Structures are given as C-alpha cells and as structure tokens.
C-alpha cells in the first residue's frame, strides 16, 4: 500500500537542475542529475554477462541505444507515455531508462509492502513497444534514510540490507517480464549522495544490492550508478569518475558489478573534443585506466545519460532563428556522440537524455520541445544509430 507521492520537486531532476544552471550559464550543457544480457563483458564480470558487442571496423562497436526519461513516464498519462515511447522506437533504441525511486513505492514504512502499480504501467508499455527497461534504483523514503539525514532523497539508506531487499523484490517481480537491467543509484560521486560522496559506503550498497538481485534473477545485469562528469566547482562535493571507480574498486564494490555507468555531456557539437568524453580513455587519469588498475580492464561502460541542450528556449529574448541554430547544433552533437562513443574503448551503450523539455525544471535537452514539436536531433539520432548497426 502506498499512501502518498513524495514531493517530486526534490527528486533526481533536482541535481540536473543545479548542474544545468551552472553549465548553461557557461554556454555548455548539463553534466548531472542502462544492456542486453549479452553485452561486452570483461575481467571480473559476474555471472549472467557474456560478450557480444565487438569492434566492427571503422564504425567501431555496435552499441546498445536507449532513451532516458528519469521519472516522467512514471507519472505520465497513457497517451503521453505512448507518444514518448514511440520516440524511442523512432530513434532506434532498444532500451529506456527509468527511475525506480524507492520512496515512490514504499513511502510509509516497512510494514506495508511496496505498491509497484505505477512501474507496472511503464514496464508493460515498454514491452508493448518492443523496448527493454533499465531501472535506476535509488531515493530511499524518509523512514529508510540514514539517521540525521532525512530532508533530501539524496540521503543514503540507513540499512544496505533493507535497500537490497527492496531491489530484490522489484527484480523478482520484473524478471519474468523481461527486466534484468539495474543501475544502483544515480551519480553517487556528487551531491546526489548526501552530504558528500562516500565511495566505501557506496561500494557496500552496490555489493549488497547486486547480490540480492542476482539471488532472484540469474540473468540480472547490475551497473555501478551513473557517474557524473562535470568539473568540480566551489561549494559542490565532487569526486571524479576515475577516482570514484578506483576507490570503489579498492573497497571491493566492482566485484559484483557487470558494468559502470557514466554521464558525459560534451557541451559542443564535436563530442570527440570534449573533456567529458576524453575522461573515458583519453585523459591522463581516465576511467579505463582506473578500471584496469582495479583489475577490470574490459568492464563495459554504459553511457546512461548524455545529450545536448537548447538553452535559448529559457531566454525570452532569444530569436526563433537563434533557437533553430541551437537545435541544429544539438542534432550535430547527437550524430557526433554516436560516432565518437562507438570508437571509444569499453563503451557498450549510449542513452540520450531526454525525450521532451521540462521548462519548469530548466531542462531543455529534449528530442521534443515542451509543446511537443519534434526537433532535428531525433532524426539525426535515428540516422546515426541506423548507420552504427550496419
């Protein structure tokens, strides 16, 4: 039984808003805040993962593709949900990424079983459209948050075992419906883990949750939560993706993960020149090097969020011509991201954020405008994805 819906203004998009404001002001795009059971596997990859995504010449790896909806589908009408999922199909996606926030399904207490009715709708609708679901599990309800931390969903759980039990209950429910892919937390290397990132604590949560999910689903594929890629700035707790991987690895957290998720937003139409993309394998201290040092040189990296914004729509003075130019740049970035990530070591999947602008949250990365008009980026993604599959 679910008594109430928590205040969504403080949900995952809260961190997207904070970082969006910072980066859009600098003229960049947001860098804040899922696999087929047979995607790229590597050293230390647990049971259930096999190797299938392989280099294919000049076009690079044949990637998995997805569209990220955060929690918008969870609360959408049936007609809105169907329109949104049709965009994923048009784009050529195999997956959608959706939040499974614990606080939405068991908000009252542990004495009431989770009510998964809302998520049932999403999973069933995705299946009807031929799409798989990557679920991001996070956001403990108030009663389950760490002592002394109860005013933000970013609070870690008071009990890793309780969080893992909730995850296992969800996995047992959805495995028969074809949902096997899980991302544990969203951006634990920034303020989305309150009050500051804690690699050791996150490693313990990842281990407990992955073991619990695998106990009920032998086909499960569990990812280390999508790591934020933005640069540190004053007043914001932040650990780089590579350093966070290294620290989680030292704490033993990678042993039960099948992949690492990452959220690079290039901020320019040439994705290959972006520092957030270079951080995967091109910078001195990069993610692939960190994985290799930790003993997992071939662990897949899933880009479970990336995209490009159209910031002009937030400025009342921006002309239609200027917005059209920004939309063309967004489309160019979409093409460049597919081509660049397909050539980037370890990368196995790319998810675009997001389907439609959310003006009230200042999130303007949609394949559609807030009013529903389709942007050129949707066609650009569809063309680039089709080319990647040849």
Stretches with model-predicted labels:
Residues 1-12:
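Terminal targeting segments of Actinobacterial cell-envelope proteins
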Residues 2-4, 55, 188, 313-390:
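Aromatic-rich peripheral "rim/lid" segments of glycoside hydrolase catalytic domains that contact
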Residues 10-34:
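Secretory targeting and sorting signals
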Residues 44, 48-95, 99-101:
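Boundary/entry segment of secreted carbohydrate-active catalytic domains
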Residues 60, 78, 160, 164, ...:
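Noncatalytic carbohydrate-binding groove/subsite architecture in carbohydrate-active enzymes
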Residues 65, 94, 177-180, 258, ...:
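Short acidic/polar active-site loop segments enriched in Thr and Asp
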Residues 83-88, 115-125, 166-170, 201-209, ...:
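A general structural detector for well-ordered alpha-helical segments in enzyme core domains, enriched
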Residues 91-236, 267, 297, 308, ...:
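Substrate-binding cleft and catalytic face of glycoside hydrolase catalytic domains
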């Amino acid at each position: 039984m679910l008594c109430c819906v928590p205040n969504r203004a403080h949900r995952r998009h809260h961190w997207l808003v904070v970082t969006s404001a910072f980066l859009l002001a600098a003229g960049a795009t947001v860098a804040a805040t899922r696999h087929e059971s047979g995607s790229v596997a590597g050293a230390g990859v647990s049971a259930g993962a096999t190797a299938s995504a392989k280099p294919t010449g000049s076009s690079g790896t044949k990637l998995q593709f997805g569209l990220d909806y955060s929690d918008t589908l969870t609360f959408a009408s049936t007609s809105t949900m169907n329109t949104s999922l049709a965009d994923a199909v048009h784009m050529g996606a195999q997956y959608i990424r959706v939040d499974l926030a614990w606080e939405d399904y068991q908000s009252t207490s542990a004495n009431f079983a989770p009510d998964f009715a809302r998520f049932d709708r999403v999973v069933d609708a995705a299946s009807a459209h031929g799409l798989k679901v990557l679920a991001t599990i996070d956001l403990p309800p108030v009663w389950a948050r760490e002592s002394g931390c109860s005013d933000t969903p970013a609070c870690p759980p008071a009990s890793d075992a309780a969080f893992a039990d909730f995850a296992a209950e969800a996995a047992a429910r959805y495995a028969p419906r074809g949902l096997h892919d899980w991302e544990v937390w969203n951006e634990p290397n920034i303020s989305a883990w309150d009050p500051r990132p804690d690699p050791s604590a996150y490693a313990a949560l990842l281990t407990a949750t992955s073991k619990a999910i695998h106990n009920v689903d032998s086909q499960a594929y569990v990812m280390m939560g999508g790591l934020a890629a933005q640069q540190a700035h004053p007043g914001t707790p932040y650990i780089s993706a590579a350093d966070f991987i290294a620290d989680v690895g030292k704490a033993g957290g990678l042993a039960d993960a099948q992949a690492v998720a990452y959220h690079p937003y290039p901020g320019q139409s040439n994705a290959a020149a972006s520092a957030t993309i270079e951080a995967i394998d091109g910078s001195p201290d990069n993610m692939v090097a960190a994985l290799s040092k930790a003993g997992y040189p071939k662990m897949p990296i899933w880009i479970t969020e990336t995209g490009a914004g159209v910031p002009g729509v937030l400025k009342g003075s921006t002309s239609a011509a200027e917005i059209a130019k920004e939309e063309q740049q967004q489309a160019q970035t979409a093409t460049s991201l597919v081509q660049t990530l397909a050539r980037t070591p370890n990368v196995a999947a790319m998810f675009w954020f997001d389907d439609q602008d959310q003006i009230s949250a200042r999130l303007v990365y949609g394949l559609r405008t807030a009013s529903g008009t389709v942007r050129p980026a949707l066609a650009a993604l569809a063309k680039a994805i089709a080319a990647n599959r040849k």
